[in-house]
């Protein structure tokens, strides 16, 4: 078989394949003989239909088309094997099929063009001399104090208040009714907002809770007092019919309670943790928050290195892999949303899928390139994770998933890949020049990209 190759963009190989006269005749005759044995033609027994009648009734164009379809597929498989090519996904017929059918004459050679996706190629740049800026996250003792404050709030005892007005930090139990605010000068009766009514509703009087102005309006009220508070729903409010709307809330304070915070002592430590003393709890949290800060710094360094690797290491990606990765991105997104309690049925409907796939494509391409670049570096530098680390990570995951059905072969593969990526990034970090800057100094990559596009 005569095959001519041509390298195409997007990790494709173009193939021009010439089907020999002998092969075209053999394929056509095989198809006619098969139809002669299997076709149901009125007035004839199966297998006894004269050739000319068969051609007239079924049609030579149909026979040529079905013959050609099989012939193209078989020829492509043979060409890929002959040329020792590694193909992924389905082939793409470059020639127009209708024209090929018209050109096809059994017993004469026929040439067609197709393209196949092949494994991606990675061109490594100077990955051993990376120079990056990254943000340094420093442990802030304030985080520890905030942690204790939050736990004190959660463990607080609510004490009824009757002799004073509501203050920030209190808890109010209220009945409320929401109304659309009438337009200026409008005297019509105001309309209730559907679904915006409630009884015995708990309102924690802290800044930033609920709609802006609501908490501030309740502060200063007393039990059994009723007031009307005017607020504006934020523009990004989940209910589109209320976003940006001005509303009037009729609020009745039924109960007012003050929070009595527990002492930060050993009893408190035992209540909120597995530690017996407040000193042990404080020491453990300091260690945890310090390690988290170090990990955040490390992540910033690794993210910066990956960004630079994407710039200096071109990757030619086949569409087959991109489409598979897009599916993976959407699957993971759906699983995360379900874990958050979000109903995905309205989002993942048939008419939304093309747009969702389009939106997921940039992320899929970036993920693929990152993975392929790091895999190529690992291959070149012979970087593999230590077997003991793989076993340790697997055992830790097994403990967490003890009562679930787990494919342990797949788990081992996933953990090995994950630790390989970590090992490569740590190796690259040792060789890179890293400038650490204060947290919050660097702009996110998407902001920088937007600015460059504006320029």
Swiss-Prot record:
Transmembrane segments: none annotated. Keywords: Cell cycle, Cell division, Chaperone, Cytoplasm, Isomerase, Rotamase. Pfam families: FKBP_C, Trigger_C, Trigger_N. InterPro entries: PPIase_dom_sf, PPIase_FKBP_dom, Trig_fac, Trigger_fac_C, Trigger_fac_C_sf, Trigger_fac_ribosome-bd_bac, Trigger_fac_ribosome-bd_sf, Trigger_fact/SurA_dom_sf. It is found in: Cytoplasm. GO terms for cellular component: cytoplasm. The keyword Nucleus does not apply. Its EC number is 5.2.1.8. It catalyses: [protein]-peptidylproline (omega=180) = [protein]-peptidylproline (omega=0). GO terms for molecular function: peptidyl-prolyl cis-trans isomerase activity; protein folding chaperone; ribosome binding. Residues 169-262 form the PPIase FKBP-type domain. It is an enzyme of class 5 (isomerase). GO terms for biological process: 'de novo' cotranslational protein folding; cell division; chaperone-mediated protein folding; protein transport; protein unfolding. Belongs to the FKBP-type PPIase family. Tig subfamily. Consists of 3 domains; the N-terminus binds the ribosome, the middle domain has PPIase activity, while the C-terminus has intrinsic chaperone activity on its own. Involved in protein export. Acts as a chaperone by maintaining the newly synthesized protein in an open conformation. Functions as a peptidyl-prolyl cis-trans isomerase. NCBIfam families: tig (TIGR00115). This is Trigger factor. It comes from Rippkaea orientalis (strain PCC 8801 / RF-1) (Cyanothece sp. (strain PCC 8801)).
């Amino acid at each position: 078989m005569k095959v001519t190759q041509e390298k195409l963009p997007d990790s494709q190989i173009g193939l021009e394949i010439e089907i020999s006269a002998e092969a075209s005749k053999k394929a056509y005759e095989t198809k006619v003989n098969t139809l002669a044995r299997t076709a149901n033609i009125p007035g004839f027994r199966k297998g006894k239909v004269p050739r000319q009648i068969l051609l007239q009734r079924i049609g030579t164009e149909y026979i040529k088309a079905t013959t050609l379809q099989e012939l193209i597929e078989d020829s492509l498989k043979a060409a890929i094997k002959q040329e020792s090519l590694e193909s992924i996904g389905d082939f793409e017929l470059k020639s127009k099929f209708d024209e090929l059918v018209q050109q096809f004459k059994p017993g004469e050679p026929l040439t067609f063009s197709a393209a196949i996706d092949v494994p991606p190629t990675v061109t490594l740049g100077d990955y051993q001399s990376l120079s990056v800026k990254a943000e340094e996250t420093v442990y802030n003792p304030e985080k520890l104090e905030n942690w204790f404050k939050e736990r004190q709030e959660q463990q607080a005892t609510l004490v009824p208040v009757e002799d004073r007005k509501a203050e920030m930090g209190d808890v109010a139990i209220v009945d409320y009714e929401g109304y659309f605010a009438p337009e200026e000068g409008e005297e019509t009766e105001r309309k209730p907002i559907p679904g915006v009514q409630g009884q015995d509703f708990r309102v924690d009087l802290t800044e930033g809770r609920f709609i802006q102005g609501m908490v501030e309006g309740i502060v200063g009220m007393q039990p059994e007092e009723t007031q009307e508070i005017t607020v504006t729903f934020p523009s990004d409010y989940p209910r589109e019919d209320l976003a940006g709307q001005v509303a009037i809330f009729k609020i009745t304070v039924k109960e007012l309670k003050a929070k009595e915070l527990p002492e930060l002592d050993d009893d408190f430590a035992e209540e909120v943790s597995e530690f017996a003393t407040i000193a042990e709890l404080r020491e453990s949290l300091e260690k945890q928050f310090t390690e988290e800060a170090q990990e955040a710094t490390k992540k910033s360094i690794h993210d910066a290195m990956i960004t630079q690797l994407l710039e200096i290491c071109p990757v030619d990606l086949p569409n087959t892999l991109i489409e598979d990765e897009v599916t993976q991105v959407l699957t993971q997104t759906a699983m995360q949303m379900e874990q958050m309690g979000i109903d995905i049925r309205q989002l993942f409907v048939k008419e939304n899928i093309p747009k969702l796939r389009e939106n997921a494509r940039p992320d899929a391409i970036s993920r693929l390139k990152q993975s392929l670049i790091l895999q190529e570096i690992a291959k070149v530098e012979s970087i593999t994770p230590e077997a003991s680390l793989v076993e340790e990570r697997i055992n830790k995951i097994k403990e967490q998933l003890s009562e679930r059905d787990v494919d342990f072969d797949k788990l081992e593969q996933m953990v090995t890949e994950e630790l390989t990526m970590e090992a490569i990034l740590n190796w690259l970090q040792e060789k890179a020049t890293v400038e650490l800057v204060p947290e919050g100094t660097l702009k996110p990559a998407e902001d920088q990209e937007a600015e460059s596009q504006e320029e």
